[in-house]
């Protein structure tokens, strides 16, 4: 060991001496004596490695307390951190999809703080059913006879098929054999549910007679799958649920539909593209309809199945139902969200998803212009900060070809180097509340459709 190396080692402090320093008192109070000591030992090992490798001390050796504080602060951050979503995708799967209404947030908090009547009947002190209250709400909204709630729509489809068609055939149009995120494919789900897929028609055209010819003594269901995350256009043909229900009645085969996103209101009244609604399919005679809780409905992640009482009963009694059931927090949030639909005149104000989707491009443009000046003052030396028109998307496989006119703040490096955009985006991701945009066409875009808290936005970007 050289004299220089020995000198560097001698500069490393003893843990006991560090802990006696007043700057470590608050750290020990906040993070605990054990964790602080554990980290100091780790840092001493790191420092010795640096000395051996480069004959120097790490820069943080000048202020051990500051480095410990920085590391423990970062360590204490939740894995699920709030972010500002300016990607232009309203229902962003990677960012948690639908924001919850205040009523849903309050309902979840209450359910977490207190015992609740999850499966308890106050009338007779007996055991109740956890889906009952929500089933009544869903029946009121959709016109269905009964309802069942599980933890997501993939689970809903799995349960629906396993409980009603295991060991039998399910007839589906080839053009509806969808794949959604995470390689969730309808054929794979059918296989897991114990069903045999009988695909009919072609990718772009399927006729009623294709279904008719496929039905045999082993057919359990005729199934429709709403292609909510892609669109086939041009020379196409598909039969709707009403026509398929009529055929099913003739052949004595029930019809079920995986609706995917599942809007409970006619979106066209808000100037948005129309999506099929569960209540329309129930009115058409579909036996079971499944859809998501956290997409266009604007609630928590959940799989909802509405339909005929006898078929829902088969789902409720299936062993998979217990494995897939929703917990009390999900049910509390979903109930509070569904109650908002009982007052449709206030829905676009109280339901965040609908509120964000219905923001006009003009309002967003004015917001962008209002925010431009302070950002130019802060970033103008390195970037051209402009207000640009853009198109938002709904996201989560909803209305894939439809875009919503919006406005964005864009950042273009004066030197034209793309690495500066990557660096800026990375800096914003490291903020206490990360700001998430997207890089496209030589610019960093911040689509403001989902920006409601301007003050927090400016506090982050002007740091």
UniProtKB/Swiss-Prot annotation:
The modification N6-(pyridoxal phosphate)lysine is found at residue 295. Its main location: cytoplasm. It is found in: Cytoplasm. GO terms for biological process: conversion of seryl-tRNAsec to selenocys-tRNAsec; selenocysteine incorporation. Keywords: Cytoplasm, Protein biosynthesis, Pyridoxal phosphate, Selenium, Transferase. Its cofactor is pyridoxal 5'-phosphate. GO terms for molecular function: L-seryl-tRNA(Sec) selenium transferase activity. The keyword Cytoplasm applies. NCBIfam families: selA. Belongs to the SelA family. Homodecamer; pentamer of dimers. Binds only one seryl-tRNA(Sec) per dimer. This is L-seryl-tRNA(Sec) selenium transferase. It comes from Shigella flexneri. The gene is selA.
């Amino acid at each position: 060991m050289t004299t220089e190396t020995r000198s560097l080692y001698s500069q490393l402090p003893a843990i006991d001496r560090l802990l006696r320093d007043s700057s470590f008192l608050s750290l020990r109070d906040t993070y605990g004596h054990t964790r602080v000591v554990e980290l100091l030992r780790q840092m001493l090992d790191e420092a010795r490695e640096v000395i051996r490798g480069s004959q120097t001390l790490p820069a943080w050796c000048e202020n051990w307390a500051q480095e410990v504080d920085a590391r423990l602060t970062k360590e204490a951050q939740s894995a699920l951190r709030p972010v500002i979503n300016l990607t232009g995708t309203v229902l962003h799967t990677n960012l948690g999809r639908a924001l919850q209404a205040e009523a849903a947030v309050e309902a979840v908090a209450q359910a977490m703080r207190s015992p609740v009547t999850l499966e308890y009947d106050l009338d007779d002190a007996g055991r109740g059913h956890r889906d009952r209250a929500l089933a009544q709400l869903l029946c009121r909204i959709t016109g269905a006879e009964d309802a069942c709630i599980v933890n997501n729509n993939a689970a809903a489809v799995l349960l629906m098929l396993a409980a009603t068609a295991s060991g039998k055939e399910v007839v589906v149009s080839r053009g509806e054999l969808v794949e959604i995120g995470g390689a969730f494919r309808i054929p794979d789900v059918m296989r897991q549910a114990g069903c045999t897929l009988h695909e009919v028609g072609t990718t772009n055209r399927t006729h009623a007679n294709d279904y008719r010819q496929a039905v045999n003594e082993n057919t359990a269901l005729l199934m429709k799958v709403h292609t909510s995350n892609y669109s086939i256009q041009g020379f196409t043909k598909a039969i709707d649920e009403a026509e398929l229900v009529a055929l099913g009645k003739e052949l004595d085969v029930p019809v079920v539909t995986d609706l995917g996103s599942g809007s409970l209101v006619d979106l066209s009244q808000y100037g948005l593209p129309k999506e099929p609604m569960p209540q329309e399919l129930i009115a058409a005679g579909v036996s079971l309809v499944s859809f998501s809780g956290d997409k266009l409905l604007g609630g928590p992640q959940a799989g909802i199945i509405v339909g005929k009482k006898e078929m829902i009963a088969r789902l409720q009694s299936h062993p998979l139902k217990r494995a897939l059931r929703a917990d009390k927090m999900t049910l509390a949030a979903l109930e509070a969200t569904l109650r908002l639909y009982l007052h449709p005149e206030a829905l676009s104000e109280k339901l965040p998803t609908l509120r964000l989707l219905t923001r006009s491009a003009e309002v967003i443009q004015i917001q962008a212009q209002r925010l431009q000046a302070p950002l130019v003052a802060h970033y103008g030396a390195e970037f051209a900060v402009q207000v640009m028109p853009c198109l938002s998307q709904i996201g989560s496989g909803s209305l894939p070809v439809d875009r919503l006119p919006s406005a964005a703040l864009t950042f273009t490096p004066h030197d034209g180097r793309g690495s500066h955009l990557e660096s800026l985006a990375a800096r914003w991701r490291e903020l206490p509340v990360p700001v998430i945009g997207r890089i496209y066409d030589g610019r960093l875009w911040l689509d403001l459709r989902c920006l409601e808290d301007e003050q927090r936005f400016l506090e982050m970007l002007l740091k």
